[in-house]
Swiss-Prot record:
Localization annotation: Plastid, Chloroplast
Keywords: Chloroplast, Plastid, Ribonucleoprotein, Ribosomal protein, RNA-binding, rRNA-binding
Protein name stated in the entry: Small ribosomal subunit protein uS11c
Family annotation (Pfam families): Ribosomal_S11
Organism this protein belongs to: Bigelowiella natans (Pedinomonas minutissima)
Molecular function via GO: rRNA binding; structural constituent of ribosome
Tagged with keyword RNA-binding: yes
Amino acid sequence: MVKQIRKLTIKKAKWKASDGIVYIYATLNNTIITIVDTSGRVVSWSSAGICGFRGARKASPFAAKTAAEYAARQCINKGINRAQVLVKGLGTGRHTSIRGLQDAGLKISLIRDITTTPHNGCRQPKRRRV
């Protein structure tokens, strides 16, 4: 008779942190939201493209709010209730994504803008004439 070999299963550690950091990267074409715990491990992430928006609709504020609510619901299920928000970029989904996080039930303790500004760095692209 052949003995059956047991499969070893590794249990993942549950999230112990109740605080997190939300990074919102709002570009002109998309909005990407990443939620990490205090040690820097990614808990959940979302973008307007993942929520089903394509093309120009990804750049809309409604798409940013939907993506923020999706990411916030995932991290609330894992036990993160409070978060600091770090916003980067000049896209249209900056403010509505913060509102989406609050609507999903995430308590926001701090909002900080970390958009980088050039000190006359690279040359800007040629302006479009329509």
